[in-house]
Amino acid sequence: MSEPTGNAAMAAAAAPAPSPGPAAAPAGTIYDLGYKRYTGARQATSTRWKVIARNQFASAWKTWWRYKVALGFAGIVTAVAGGVMFLLQDRVVNGVVVPGNIAAVLSDQALPMSITWYTRAAFLLSITLVSSVIARDMQSGAFTFYFARSVRPRDYVLGKLIGMFAVTSTVMLAGPLALALARLALSESLDQLVATLPILPKALAIGVLSTLAFAAVPLGFSAIIANPRHAMALWAVYYLVVGGMAYLLARLMKNGFGAVDITMAIEGLTYDVLDIVQLRGRSKRIETPLAVTSLLVHAAAGVSIIAYRVRRAHLAGIGGAS
């Protein structure tokens, strides 16, 4: 075999050496892509409760049997009571079918008589949704998610309360207000409108107190037990059994002990504020101060239980905010 010529040897020497292939990265290599500070919009710490409240309402709206059934029930009550008001203002009914003075009385009583049905819709909502909210968070470990993001206990409590208040208000507050506005709209004269105008703030006050009770008390029961079913059962026992016992004792003893029953307190407040003689109903008439005190005490007890349980969970090491 002949040796390469001089020119061939020089060309081979001048040729670039082949570049080595890319080295295989060792297993477990971490690629440092650099750190870039977040430059987007930031929310103040004091507004974090709003996020929780909005999430509560949005989550409730997505459910059918937990929220929308109770909402539909309240809508039916509003439609029926409003229809009765409208029919009693009709000239054929008013004065022909029903005497004029009786028609006016029945029209005024449509709102207070519907309160009992609104409380049933609110109880349905509380038993299917409100009474298990915090229990579900405790059972699923959602507290870790909340407090790991520096959500303060008071933000959690405030967000849950306002969220459930907003949900319950669509059942217990919107209906009475709609009926009060309907009663004003059906006034036959300006004098009658002015005379009926106080029904609006009265309906607002009744609705706010009732909504507060049906939001805070079931939510308090949901904070007692970490099992949603047990929390719902505990709230149902208190509302039905304890409330029923208070009703029976009030009838036997002829006193205001029936205000322990939330529904009875709301009914007594409604009849007293709207100055309607209670011809039939749960028991002896409950005066406004006693009814308001009962509803506020119930709400305060519910909020206290929620605050205690959430603060205790926070201090147990679940989160790190203060």
Predicted regions and their residues:
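Short, contiguous pre-domain boundary segments
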Residues: 21-43, 306
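Hydrophobic/aromatic residues in alpha-helical transmembrane segments
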Residues: 126-130, 174, 178, 216-217, ...
